[in-house]
């Protein structure tokens, strides 16, 4: 469970170099971390910097079985998406015998997997210069699923499958055309492919991009 800002300030003892920089106030935003190409190895870093803005949604819950010497053990496998709806999104998976524990693990992993998402107005039909869509066409793949995201004019909405919509919305994308290949019924791959496509938005980076995030 995430700590309140006060509890985080009092109880969090950073174990990594980046964590110490964050708590000491020498790093004040996630953008700084990514600009310096530093790793996020503690979920508390994300809580500390954008915790109040962070939202999470569970997009897939499955009961899976594991064979052991003692027989079959049932566990929940959960996929969670987190984001601040303003340029940052993460996807995480968690497994546990109790659903609540699996969700908590997934949220923790999603924070460790958080990425910046470059937004813009890449559609020739719009040209409003507002960060409402993707700036150019991007592709992502996971397993058999491939997702292609194309810029859409303002007011189009998210033309995508339900699982992909969650990732896009929490990333702060409001308008996009999406095209898919493969078995999108496999939710975990559909979500990861969308996430991987958004990763590509920072394939081409200029210093000005960080100021706009």
From Swiss-Prot:
Taxonomic placement: Archaea, Thermoproteota, Thermoprotei, Desulfurococcales, Pyrodictiaceae
Xref: InterPro entries: Ribosomal_Su5_D2-typ_SF (IPR020568), Ribosomal_uS5 (IPR000851), Ribosomal_uS5_arc (IPR047866), Ribosomal_uS5_C (IPR005324), Ribosomal_uS5_euk/arc (IPR005711), Ribosomal_uS5_N (IPR013810), Ribosomal_uS5_N_CS (IPR018192), Ribsml_uS5_D2-typ_fold_subgr (IPR014721)
Keyword Ribonucleoprotein: yes
Assembly notes: Part of the 30S ribosomal subunit. Contacts protein S4.
Tagged with keyword Nucleotide-binding: no
Xref: Pfam families: Ribosomal_S5 (PF00333), Ribosomal_S5_C (PF03719)
Domain note: The N-terminal domain interacts with the head of the 30S subunit; the C-terminal domain interacts with the body and contacts protein S4. The interaction surface between S4 and S5 is involved in control of translational fidelity.
Residues forming coiled coils: none
Alphabetized PANTHER family for the sequence: 40S RIBOSOMAL PROTEIN S2 (PTHR13718:SF4), RIBOSOMAL S SUBUNIT (PTHR13718)
Functional note: With S4 and S12 plays an important role in translational accuracy.
Domain S5 DRBM: 54-117
Family under the similarity heading: Belongs to the universal ribosomal protein uS5 family.
GO molecular function: rRNA binding; structural constituent of ribosome
Taxonomy, superkingdom: Archaea
Record protein name field: Small ribosomal subunit protein uS5
Keyword terms of this UniProt record: Ribonucleoprotein, Ribosomal protein, RNA-binding, rRNA-binding
Gene Ontology biological-process annotations: translation
GO cellular component, one term: cytosolic small ribosomal subunit
